[in-house]
Amino acid sequence: MKHIKKILAAGICLAASLYLTPAMAAYEIDPDYTMKYNDPGKIEQRYRWHGPYEVKSVVLSDGEAKYGNYKYKVWYPVQQAGRERPRPLVITLNGTGGSCDKDEPIFRHLASWGFVVAGNTDAQTAPGFSAEWTLDQALAANQDSKSPLYHQIDEKKIGIVGYSQGGAGAYNTLEGKDGDKFKTMVTVSGVTESIGKKLHLPVWIYDPSKVTIPVFMAAGTGILDRKLITPLDEMKENYSKIQSKTAAMGRRKDADHLDIQTAADAYITAWLRWQLDDDIYAKRVFTGKDPEILRNPAWDNAEVRNPETTQPNRLKSELINGSSRKFGG
């Protein structure tokens, strides 16, 4: 019965995707995407570029029925001999029509900063099943002496990142059997309640008040995100319902649904470096007396909350970002 429910949920998502505008269709990310952005934030600039690690990849499985017939692939940092240590794991969920093959450049970028990044080719990720299967296989590889991932993953430091309908998938994964294994979540233009209702997709509707881990929510100010996928009022409502004491949100100016993954990539990397790798430089984007995201003119509607921040208000961000300056991306 459980397997039948999974098939039905995936079928409903697939049917609904036929009604989505072609403008929302996934596309292959340019391997040189980091070159197109002129980031005004100093810390943002640092995490825009590739990190210090060479990156390799390995396919965990491909076309196995028990894993939904998807391909599962991992990108991981190559560590210096004698200096190896288990690295944080990041599970990714695609947007509608997306795949790890199309998004490979951003996964390589994240892995270059010391993360083991696991993705798949599931184009309908909202139910969260493929995220669970990705995690299962990554953790199995971590215990397999024949795998290049053997003892490479820190199983106490696992994050989840969901783009578009994958945002709903991230919430659903947290409510699943492995929810307590995740230490942080990032949603990137995550679908909100209104679009789920318009498409009659209950699997796209979730309860943010059940989330107790640190969360970063990013979106763009372009028309698709603003009017359809991640409207500001609903994004704020979701943010307010998150139960974690640590959270942040922001909307990247001049970015829309199709390029928000690359536009927000630097701050997503910084968030994960802070939350999963204790990077004290990266945390300055979101903490302290003057968090960079609140004064970065390339970001709008930014908010932060955490025990270390003394000025967690969006008013400052809105006043600073009120100009009409435009930035690359």
Where is each model-derived feature located?
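C-terminal segment of classical bacterial N-terminal signal peptides
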Residues: 17-23
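The feature captures the conserved acid-bearing segment of alpha/beta-hydrolase catalytic domains
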Residues: 183-260
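N-terminal cap/lid segment of alpha/beta-hydrolase-fold proteins
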Residues: 26-85
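Short beta-strand element of the alpha/beta-hydrolase
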Residues: 84-95
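Bacterial N-terminal signal peptides that target proteins for export
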Residues: 1-9
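Gly/Ser-rich "nucleophile elbow"/oxyanion-hole loop immediately N-terminal to the catalytic nucleophile
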Residues: 79-86, 129-168, 175-177
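Short amphipathic alpha-helix adjacent to the substrate-entry channel of hydrolases
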Residues: 101-119
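Alpha/beta-hydrolase-fold serine-hydrolase catalytic core, especially in secreted/extracellular enzymes
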Residues: 253-329
